[in-house]
């Protein structure tokens, strides 16, 4: 294994990397009805029109923080796959303990 690290099964010199489409503005995929449903589940009766953009902003920030911590745990364990336990530990670190996903 010529310096390929853990699990280097590849033949040849490496080949081209696949390109992934750059994802922009996907936060708009959290639709107005989806936010309404979440609010209803939380017991909200009426919703101001300004709530939707603010909710998207807060959700994006929250997910960025959780994902950043999860990826940190993954990299520390020298893995390439984020596991459910990485997310559980990331949430616990932020003071939001989640039960039911192992550990």
Curated annotation (Swiss-Prot):
Q: Write the record's keywords in alphabetical order, separated by commas.
A: Chromosome, DNA-binding, Nucleosome core, Nucleus
What start and end residues bound the annotated signal peptide?
none
Compartments where found? Nucleus; Chromosome
Keyword match DNA-binding: yes
Coiled coil feature spans: none
- Region Disordered, as annotated, extends over 1-20
List the Pfam families: CENP-T_C (PF15511)
Residue intervals annotated as DNA-binding region are 17-21
Locate the compositionally biased regions of type Gly residues.
1-14
UniProt keyword Aminoacyl-tRNA synthetase, yes or no: no
Quote the cellular component terms of the Gene Ontology held in the record. Answer: nucleosome; nucleus
Molecular function via GO: DNA binding; protein heterodimerization activity; structural constituent of chromatin
Superkingdom, natural source: Eukaryota
Function text: Core component of nucleosome. Nucleosomes wrap and compact DNA into chromatin, limiting DNA accessibility to the cellular machineries which require DNA as a template. Histones thereby play a central role in transcription regulation, DNA repair, DNA replication and chromosomal stability. DNA accessibility is regulated via a complex set of post-translational modifications of histones, also called histone code, and nucleosome remodeling.
Record family assignment: Belongs to the histone H4 family.
Q: How does it assemble?
A: The nucleosome is a histone octamer containing two molecules each of H2A, H2B, H3 and H4 assembled in one H3-H4 heterotetramer and two H2A-H2B heterodimers. The octamer wraps approximately 147 bp of DNA.
Quote the protein name from its UniProt record: Histone H4
């Amino acid at each position: 294994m010529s310096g390929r690290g853990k699990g280097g099964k590849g033949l040849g010199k490496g080949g081209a990397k696949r390109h992934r489409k750059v994802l922009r503005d996907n936060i708009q995929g959290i639709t107005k009805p989806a936010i309404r449903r979440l609010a209803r589940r939380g017991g909200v009766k009426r919703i101001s029109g300004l709530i939707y953009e603010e909710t998207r902003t807060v959700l994006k920030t929250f997910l960025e923080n959780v994902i950043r911590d999860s990826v940190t745990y993954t990299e520390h364990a020298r893995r390439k796959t984020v596991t459910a336990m990485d997310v559980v530990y990331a949430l616990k670190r932020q003071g939001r303990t989640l039960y039911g996903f192992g550990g």
